[in-house]
């Protein structure tokens, strides 16, 4: 009888990535297979997120439900990982006696070892340290699950925004070596992956070591990934405006594999609130980035994050945010009502914005962005869009689902053979959260792949130095 593993994941795409690596790790080294049913599992893992309000209590409520399973099966192993584990490891140990393992985002690679410690009789094995990049060195080879894949290129954040727990739960910025990332993506491409999403808490701060002792910038990494055979689309998340340098913008100008969609969190349009948040930039600097981006890639769509009701936010501050939303014409947003995160500088500020006022501002903001998104979607009516077919439609399994470059889901009637490939569809209807398409042509009619000589690729970024020696600059 095979051993079963159940993982419950809360939070960001980085957590989703980490959970997939936990499953791969325990599957390869200890033979565990995933199950959707906690009642069937031999190991229960909770991968937590500390961004939202009452994150700690949410963890204890879940552990209370799992405790009933452990009461029935004393051999059941329960582990808690992620950012809440990193921040509240001792509290979890003290309050939840049913928990056997507590591990942080940077120590998930030690799971097999920690499980063995529990089996040898040790209680509450805890490791929430920050051993830099060691985590990636000890994970199994990547395994593709469809035509898209997430690849973590760096961890942590060193910006210390006043409201954010990430530097305290995931540590400061640490970048993976560029060769390791390129190898992982090449392996995924061999398995049929066509689109990669590069992950990091502050992904454009990437500074990875190269094989010759140099440093690879994020802009250089994007071009290296674009050169990998089989990779036709590149996305990345999440970025910080102060790291969005001109060399990254230049990649949008000459690298078609980089999609015409960017998620660039701004949090507020008020300079006063941005200063209180310790964001390190003003609203006009953010707009300057967008202006230069749209010069390089005129059709790019922009999404962002907003925090509503930050301590001291006045009606005038909120009006500044709404003005920024209008000026930038955001296409999508992740918007949240502010709630203090324990241990952050902002937690010491008086939460002086009335909750009803916060809710009203949030509704106004979301309504405006929904209107702008629908306007963009209506402009797509009658156009032909190239989409990567990800699988069956969620609402109708007899149809297919794909995604446009600007991150819109399109449902259409198509054949199973199109899954994992690009197709062209005509947009025939528009909905709030998706588009309706009509199949036009498949990948075999697109002439997507062209045979290129090495000299053609090198010529793309060829430069001559002062001595007339030709060099390749990625």
UniProtKB/Swiss-Prot annotation:
Presence of the UniProt keyword Transferase in the record: yes
Entry's EC annotation: 2.8.4.3
Location of the MTTase N-terminal domain: 3-120
CDD domains: Radical_SAM
Cofactor note text: Binds 2 [4Fe-4S] clusters. One cluster is coordinated with 3 cysteines and an exchangeable S-adenosyl-L-methionine.
Reaction catalyzed: N(6)-dimethylallyladenosine(37) in tRNA + (sulfur carrier)-SH + AH2 + 2 S-adenosyl-L-methionine = 2-methylsulfanyl-N(6)-dimethylallyladenosine(37) in tRNA + (sulfur carrier)-H + 5'-deoxyadenosine + L-methionine + A + S-adenosyl-L-homocysteine + 2 H(+)
Assigned keywords, A-Z: 4Fe-4S, Cytoplasm, Iron, Iron-sulfur, Metal-binding, S-adenosyl-L-methionine, Transferase, tRNA processing
GO molecular function annotations of the record: 4 iron, 4 sulfur cluster binding; metal ion binding; N6-isopentenyladenosine methylthiotransferase activity
InterPro entries named in the record: Elp3/MiaA/NifB-like_rSAM, Methylthiotransferase, Methylthiotransferase_CS, Methylthiotransferase_N, Methylthiotransferase_N_sf, MiaB_methiolase, rSAM, rSAM_horseshoe
Cofactor needs: [4Fe-4S] cluster
TRAM domain mapped to chain residues: 378-441
Biological process per Gene Ontology, one example term: tRNA methylthiolation
Residues annotated as binding [4Fe-4S] cluster 1: 12, 49, 83
GO cellular component terms given for this protein: cytosol
PROSITE patterns (UniProt xref): MTTASE_N (PS51449), MTTASE_RADICAL (PS01278), RADICAL_SAM (PS51918), TRAM (PS50926)
Binding site for [4Fe-4S] cluster 2: 157, 161, 164
Subcellular localization, as worded in the UniProt entry: Cytoplasm
Location of the Radical SAM core domain: 143-375
Superkingdom of the source species: Bacteria
Assembly: Monomer.
Functional description taken from the UniProt entry: Catalyzes the methylthiolation of N6-(dimethylallyl)adenosine (i(6)A), leading to the formation of 2-methylthio-N6-(dimethylallyl)adenosine (ms(2)i(6)A) at position 37 in tRNAs that read codons beginning with uridine.
Cross-referenced PANTHER family: CDK5 REGULATORY SUBUNIT-ASSOCIATED PROTEIN 1, MITOCHONDRIAL TRNA METHYLTHIOTRANSFERASE CDK5RAP1
Similarity comment: Belongs to the methylthiotransferase family. MiaB subfamily.
Matching NCBIfam families: miaB-methiolase, MiaB/RimO family radical SAM methylthiotransferase
Protein name as it appears in the record: tRNA-2-methylthio-N(6)-dimethylallyladenosine synthase
């Amino acid at each position: 009888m095979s051993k079963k593993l159940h993982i419950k994941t809360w939070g960001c795409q980085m957590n989703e990535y980490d959970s997939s690596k936990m499953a791969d790790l325990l599957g390869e080294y200890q033979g565990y297979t995933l199950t959707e049913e906690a009642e069937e599992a031999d190991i229960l893992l909770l991968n937590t997120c500390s961004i939202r309000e009452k994150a700690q209590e949410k963890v204890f409520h879940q552990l209370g439900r799992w405790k009933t399973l452990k009461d029935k099966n004393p051999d059941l192993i329960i582990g808690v990982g992620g950012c809440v584990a990193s921040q509240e490891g001792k509290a979890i140990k003290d309050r939840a006696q049913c928990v056997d393992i507590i591990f942080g985002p940077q120590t998930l690679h030690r799971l097999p070892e920690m499980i063995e410690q529990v089996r040898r009789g040790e209680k509450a094995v805890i490791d929430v340290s920050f051993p830099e990049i060691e985590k990636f060195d000890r994970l199994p080879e990547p395994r593709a699950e469809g035509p898209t894949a997430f690849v973590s290129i760096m961890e942590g954040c060193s910006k210390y925004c006043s409201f954010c727990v990430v530097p305290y739960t995931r540590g400061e910025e640490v970048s993976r070596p560029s060769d390791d990332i390129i190898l992982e993506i090449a392996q995924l491409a061999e398995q049929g992956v066509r689109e990669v999403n590069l992950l990091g808490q502050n992904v454009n701060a990437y500074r990875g070591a190269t094989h010759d002792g140099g440093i690879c910038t994020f802009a250089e990494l994007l071009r290296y990934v674009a050169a990998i055979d089989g990779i036709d689309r590149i996305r990345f998340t999440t970025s910080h405006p102060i790291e969005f340098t001109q060399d990254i913008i230049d990649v949008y100008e000459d690298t078609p594999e980089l999609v015409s969609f960017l998620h660039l969190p701004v949090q507020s349009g008020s300079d006063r609130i941005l200063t209180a948040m310790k964001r390190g930039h003003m609203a006009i600097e953010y707009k300057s980035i967008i202006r230069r981006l749209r010069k390089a890639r005129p059709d790019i769509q922009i999404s962002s994050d907003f925090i509503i009701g930050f301590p001291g936010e006045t009606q005038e501050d909120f009006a500044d945010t709404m003005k920024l939303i209008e000026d930038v014409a955001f296409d999508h947003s992740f918007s949240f009502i502010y709630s203090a995160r324990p241990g952050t500088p902002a937690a010491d500020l008086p939460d002086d914005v009335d909750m009803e006022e916060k809710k009203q501002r949030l509704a106004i903001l979301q309504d405006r962005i929904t209107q702008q998104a629908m306007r963009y979607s209506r402009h797509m009516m009658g156009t032909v869009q190239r989409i990567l077919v990800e699988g069956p439609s969620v609402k109708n399994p007899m149809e297919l689902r794909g995604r446009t470059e600007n991150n819109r889901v399109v449902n259409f009637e198509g054949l199973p053979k199109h899954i994992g490939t690009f197709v062209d569809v005509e947009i025939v209807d528009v909905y709030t959260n998706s588009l309706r398409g009509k199949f036009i042509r498949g990948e075999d009619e697109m002439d997507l792949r062209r045979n290129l000589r090495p000299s053609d690729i090198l010529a793309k970024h060829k430069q001559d130095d002062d001595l007339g020696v030709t060099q390749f600059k990625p």
